[in-house]
Structure formats: structure tokens, C-alpha cells
Amino acid sequence: MVVQNVDEPRKAARRFGLRVTDTRPALVPLTFEAGLLETLTPLAGVAVDARVASAPGEKTRKAAFDEAMLFTHRGLSGPAILQISSYWREGEAIVAAMAPGRDVFEELKRARTDNGRQAIHTALGHIVPRRLAEVVVEREGVSG
């Protein structure tokens, strides 16, 4: 069995003046940093339909995917995240709209008008999964 350095063909291509694209993992889940992980671990197993987009950056082109997104014990996964991982670069932002196509603010205002005693996390829980609503309300310090 011959073991060859997997980078040798790339080095040879460069020596011949060919343009070589840097490789990196793709179609992978994204992990949270420690502080965010602690806050969002209770959401493990929660899935939402989301619009996940990359923010165009120095090395990133704009891309967006409307698919399921799953909170895991380590971060985010699901079809939308696996797709966007091909475009994301470390240090660049991604944006996840977890109620795409809905005006959440208007829906919450309407819920307040229709049922003023309803807790905000309950009203938001009609738009996104209840556990997600509870974490968002607590994390953002929203009351009313």
C-alpha cells in the first residue's frame, strides 16, 4: 500500500501555474461557542423551518436556503445549515429567519390586542416552537 500526501497533487498543480481552490469541510453542522452553547443547549431536538443566509463577506458570496434547521446538543444542523456550511467562512455571519415570510411583530401586536393577558412567550410560541419562544424571551429580557 502506498500512502501519498493528499496535498501533493495540489502542490504539483500550483507548480504548473494552475489555479487551485483551497479545500475545507462542507455540508457540516455548525457548532456554538461555549457561552451560546450553554444558553441554547435546552433547545436540542427543536426543529424549525427557516431561511438561512450567509452575509456576503470578503471571502463569502451571498447564499440562502429555505429548509429545516435543527438545534442539536452542540449547535445547528439540518438541511438549511448543511447547505449554508458550503458558503460560510469562519468569522463571517449567517442569519437564520425562524419565521420566514411572517411579520412576527405584527402577529405579536395582534395577539396583544386579542388577548392582552397572554404572556409574550405564549404568543411567540404560536409562531415558533414553544421551547424556542421561551429561550428567546428569556435571553432577550422581553416582558409583557
Tell me what each language-model feature is:
Residues E8-P9, L36:
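General structural feature for long, well-ordered alpha-helical segments within catalytic domains
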Residues L18-R24, V28-G144:
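An anion/pyrophosphate-binding glycine-rich loop and adjacent beta-alpha core
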Residues Q4-D7, A64:
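Generic non-transmembrane alpha-helix signal with a bias for helix starts/N-cap capping motifs
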Residues R10-V20:
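Gly/Ser/Thr-rich active-site loops/lids in small-molecule metabolic enzymes
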Residues M1-N5, A12-R14, M69-T72:
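Short hydrophobic core segments
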